[in-house]
């Protein structure tokens, strides 16, 4: 990092936002009561008050099963809320980093590159792609597609037939923060680690008694293989 940057994070009380706040003592993370992203005026007021150099937009409706139950609410938060952030940031020329998801891909081949065809398979993925579309309208922005887990795997079951580049938050979050601080990195980038099944990830994170789960056992239509081609990431973050 060449100079100090003032960073504002939306969704600072969430899993990712909380961890990002720990990485830099001066991160600003206004509570939802102050910055409801569905309130365009509140977003503008916060950016004028804190005058950040970078906004990392983590706030989102993130649970695919819950999104299936409340798709309209999810679309509002993930698309309209993101559009409010984009407009306010662009009017003030503030760098915007948007946290997206690997679920924007169909999941039929894996090893996805940033420019590969997008084909969401559930409401959650569509809502996050809608947010991406809003962010793409602003040149001073970075879309980070990623997937992460708490460092302690939180579930009793894990998919044996779903493959991903997901990893522990302690691995993913520092890379996100590093990229957010690089003004020359714009567009879209994939962040993750090697391809693995979700069960393999659970075992890696110490969940030795995790039970098998299969894609056919759930109703929210998760994609089968959203693993990433990480060439772009490695070229940027190489030592």
Pin down the residues of each PLM region.
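N-terminal Rossmann NAD(P)H-binding glycine-rich loop of SDR-like oxidoreductase domains
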Residues: 2-24
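Adenosine-cofactor binding site in Rossmann-like domains, unifying the SAM/SAH pocket
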Residues: 25-46
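Glycine-rich NAD(P)-binding loop of the Rossmann-fold in SDR/ketoreductase-type enzymes
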Residues: 38, 69, 73-84, 118, ...
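NAD(P)H-binding glycine-rich loop region in Rossmannoid oxidoreductase-like domains
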Residues: 40-77, 88
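Conserved Rossmann-fold NAD(P)-dependent oxidoreductase catalytic core, especially the SDR/UDP-sugar
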Residues: 84-119
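Active-site Tyr-X1-5-Lys
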Residues: 119-147
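Substrate-positioning beta->alpha
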Residues: 155-183, 187
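Mid/C-terminal beta-alpha module of Rossmann-like enzyme folds, strongest
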Residues: 175-225
């Amino acid at each position: 990092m060449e100079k100090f940057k003032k960073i504002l994070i939306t969704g600072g009380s969430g899993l990712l936002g909380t961890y990002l706040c720990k990485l830099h003592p001066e991160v600003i993370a206004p509570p939802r009561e102050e910055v409801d992203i569905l309130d365009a005026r509140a977003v503008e007021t916060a950016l004028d008050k804190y005058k950040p150099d970078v906004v990392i937009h983590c706030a989102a409706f993130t649970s695919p099963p819950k999104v299936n139950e409340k798709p309209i609410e999810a679309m509002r938060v993930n698309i309209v809320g993101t559009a409010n952030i984009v407009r306010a940031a662009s009017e003030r020329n503030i760098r915007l980093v948007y946290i997206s998801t690997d679920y924007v891909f169909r999941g039929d081949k894996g090893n996805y590159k940033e420019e590969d065809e997008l084909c969401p398979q559930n409401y959650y993925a569509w809502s996050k792609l809608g947010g991406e579309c809003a962010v793409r309208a602003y040149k001073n922005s970075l879309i980070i597609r990623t997937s992460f887990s708490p460092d302690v795997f939180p579930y009793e079951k894990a998919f044996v037939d779903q493959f991903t580049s997901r990893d522990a938050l302690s691995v993913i979050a520092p890379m996100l923060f590093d990229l957010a601080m690089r003004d020359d990195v714009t567009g879209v980038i994939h962040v993750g680690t090697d391809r693995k099944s979700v069960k393999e990830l659970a075992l890696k994170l110490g969940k030795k008694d995790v039970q098998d789960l299969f894609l056919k056992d759930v109703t929210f239509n998760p994609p089968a293989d959203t693993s990433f081609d990480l060439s772009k990431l490695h070229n940027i973050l190489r030592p």
